[in-house]
Regions:
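Residue-level signature of catalytic and energy-coupling elements of molecular machines
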Residues: 49, 79, 116, 149, ...
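Conserved beta-strand segments of the P-loop GTPase G domain that flank and frequently precede/overlap
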Residues: 50-51, 117-118, 154-155
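Short amphipathic alpha-helical segments
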Residues: 8-10, 88-90, 128-130, 164-165
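C-terminal regions of RecA-like/P-loop NTPase motor modules
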Residues: 22, 30, 56-75, 102-112, ...
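Conserved H-loop
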Residues: 1, 118-120
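Helical hairpin unit composed of two closely spaced alpha helices linked by a short loop
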Residues: 73-117
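Cytosolic-facing regulatory segments adjacent to core modules
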Residues: 1-72, 86, 184-188
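Active-site-proximal loop/turn and secondary-structure-junction residues that shape catalytic pockets
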Residues: 53, 82, 121-123
């Protein structure tokens, strides 16, 4: 996803605007007012997006070091791990992903900042009756599971079963947490805003 696409998604999420309306330009006066109101704070937020394709862990480390010195660094997000490149010295893609995973762990320690790395899943969860992801579904390497302090999955029943009673609902599945419990957190899914929120409690 390009830098522009990410910024548009963040704008829609913050302003609670239908992403499709923004793409097509079908915004009314109220929509434009909300867009402008949220554009200022977002432009001033300390968020830096680098959409260079196929970066290596060494390049990520170098950019993070520079950013930490110049601006400060509180969080690093990789979207997504399998799009990164290794150093070219490994014999298989699985070994390359393992190397990338270990390198991101080292970057987190050096920068004293958490690294959130998105990852692809294998197709195994598509073939099960219960499509909820499991640790074994992490694609191309078991090293991701081993290196990560926390592994979390997102699941929406409506994606697989359109007639489900759990419409506009999602589950945040904490499958691994090195220093805490595992479990599932219910969320609300606002698809038109590409946004998750706290689940509404039923009384």
């Amino acid at each position: 996803m390009s830098r522009e696409q990410l910024v548009n998604r963040m704008l829609c999420s913050e302003a609670m605007l239908d992403a499709q309306k923004l793409r097509t330009g079908e915004l009314d006066d109220n929509d434009w007012a909300e867009l402008i109101r949220h554009m200022g704070p977002l432009s001033e937020a300390p968020i830096y997006i680098d959409d260079t394709p196929g970066v290596t862990p060494m390049e990520v480390r170098s950019k993070c070091r520079r950013l930490k010195v110049e601006k400060g660094l509180g969080l690093i997000v990789i979207d997504y791990l399998q799009l990164m490149s290794g150093n070219g010295r490994t014999d298989s893609r699985q070994q390359e992903i393992s190397e990338i995973s270990r390198s991101l762990k080292a970057i987190a320690r050096e920068m004293e900042a958490p690294v959130i790395a998105l990852s692809q899943l294998s197709r195994a969860c598509e073939q099960r009756a219960d499509h909820r992801p499991m640790l074994s579904d992490l694609r191309e390497s078991g090293a991701i599971e081993q290196d990560a302090d926390v592994v979390a999955f997102l699941y929406r029943d409506e994606y697989y079963f359109p007639d489900t009673e759990k419409k506009n609902m999602a589950e945040l599945i904490i499958a691994k947490q090195r220093n805490g419990p595992t479990g599932t957190v219910d969320l609300t899914w606002m698809g038109q805003y590409t946004k998750f929120g706290n689940a509404l409690k039923k009384f």
